[in-house]
């Protein structure tokens, strides 16, 4: 999303669920240090394991994968300590090996879809993961905050804009939406 709170994690979970309902094999990866995607898949709140947690602890990140259905696998981020949360510069560079792992999974053909819930930050690992993506969606709410951000911050190359939480009866949202129809060429219908 272009900012936190626009529903990116929820949309990622819903898309993963919908694709597996259509018979597609899906891996959904949480790349957000908040580690919230797992909650959309009924993973216990106290579950601390995840791919990043495993890598930081010197373990194999593949062991952190969870089978949700026969066609949907989840790779949670894992829980960071308070110290790690406050000092991301100390650990982010240690996570880059996940990129080659995801490339291998993509090449294996095991999954028709690998969905990555990316944080809205400019970290090195976020840029590395984004470079692996064939397509990207920038999730927005129709509000002044997202409107300003669409004009002030660059979207990833080729990203499409997907509106979430659009309220037809809101005059303010309709006004902003009308502006976007004229100014945002990558707006999904």
Predicted regions and their residues:
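P-loop/Walker-type NTP enzyme "switch/lid" segment
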Residues: 1, 28-106, 112
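Walker A/P-loop phosphate-binding motif and the immediately C-terminal alpha-helix
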Residues: 1-34
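Short histidine/acidic/glycine/proline-rich micro-motifs that form metal-
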Residues: 3-6, 81, 165-168
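Short strand->helix junction
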Residues: 4-6, 44, 143
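A conditional alpha-helix N-cap/helix-loop micro-motif detector
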Residues: 9, 94-95, 119
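Conserved catalytic-core segment of NTP-binding enzymes
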Residues: 103-188
């Amino acid at each position: 999303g272009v900012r936190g709170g626009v529903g990116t994690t929820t949309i990622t979970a819903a898309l993963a669920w919908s694709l597996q309902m259509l018979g597609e094999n899906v891996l959904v990866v949480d790349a957000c240090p908040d580690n919230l995607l797992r909650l959309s898949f009924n993973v216990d709140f106290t579950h601390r394991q995840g791919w990043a947690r495993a890598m930081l602890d010197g373990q194999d990140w593949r062991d952190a994968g969870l089978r949700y259905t026969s066609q949907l696998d989840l790779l949670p981020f894992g829980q960071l300590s308070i110290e790690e949360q406050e000092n991301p510069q100390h650990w982010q560079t240690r996570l880059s090996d996940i990129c080659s792992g995801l490339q291998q999974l993509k090449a294996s053909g095991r999954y028709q879809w690998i969905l990555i819930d990316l944080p809205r930050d400019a970290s090195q690992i976020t840029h590395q993961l984004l470079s692996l993506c064939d397509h990207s969606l920038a999730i927005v709410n129709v509000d002044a905050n997202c409107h300003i951000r669409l004009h002030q911050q660059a979207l990833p190359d080729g990203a499409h804009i997907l509106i979430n939480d659009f309220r037809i009866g809101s005059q303010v949202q309709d006004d902003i939406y009308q502006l976007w129809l004229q100014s945002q060429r990558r707006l999904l219908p």
